[in-house]
Amino acid sequence: MARDPSHLPRACRPPAIPVRVAEAALEISRTAIEEQLKICGHKKDADVFELFLSQKELTEVIDLSRFKKLKYLWLHHNKLHGITFLTRNYCLAELYLNNNAIFDIEGLHYLPSLHILLLHHNELINLDATVKELKGMLNLKTLTLYQNPLCQYNLYRLYIIYHLPGVELLDRNQVTEKERRSMITLFNHKKAHIVQSIAFRGKVDASWDPRSPFKQKPAQRVPSDFAFANNVDKTMFDDPEDAVFVRSMKRSAMAITSLNWDTVPTREEKYLEEKDTGPAQMLTITLR
């Protein structure tokens, strides 16, 4: 059963579809599916492994649970608003839903075998609801969400990587180890504190507990003529603490300077004049 769209803002809700129109839309999808079965020569539902239903002007799709062995489904470049037709397609491995008008992806958690999911160019708004629906997909490796309203949130990419650690290719870009380390620091403060404590032999302030910058509102871009020192992307934050924290996370190296004791003669060396008594030197260590 599809989620009640009343939880969405009025301007973002999908338009109500009259019963007759919905029935007609389902009939159109049924006809398109039957045509595909004839083209491929399938006589039994058990023989269907793939369905190509893109660019059919579909607004609704009939229930596809009859195709138990369906593995590949193309539904891109249609006019779909939701996904309520994939409830028992447990073998589905690749699903192409890009270039539609999808507001809600409720129902995708029924697809445990899915490893490729394309959802770019849709109308997804709620990032938390989207992530919640995708969390159970342990086999998901490739995901696209770009050109959706939810992509406008700050740290959107790191948020997805944190909650979907199995994803290797996000929005056509490989997930890097640097991104994985960054998302741990930003969203898993306890684990980050343990990692730093091990790295610095327990010499880390136990009170360190930064706030999650993801709770802030979407960043606002200031006019191009607004300039201030050392500001690169000109992203404005509602809370100064968030700005300070995000800025600190962008530092790629840390330098530690101390006295090089190898250049300082001992008392005995001074007495025996075995070592040049020149000025002591400083030693700089850079950590990355």
From Swiss-Prot:
Q: Where are the LRR repeats?
A: 47-68, 69-90, 91-112, 113-134
Q: Which PROSITE patterns match?
A: LRR
- Supply the gene name: LRRC72
Traced from the root, the source organism's taxonomic lineage reads: Eukaryota, Metazoa, Chordata, Craniata, Vertebrata
Q: List, for all copies, the residue spans of the domain called LRRCT.
A: 148-186
Q: Which domain of life is it from?
A: Eukaryota
Q: Which Gene3D superfamilies match?
A: Ribonuclease Inhibitor
Keyword tags: Leucine-rich repeat, Repeat
Q: What is this protein identified as?
A: Leucine-rich repeat-containing protein 72
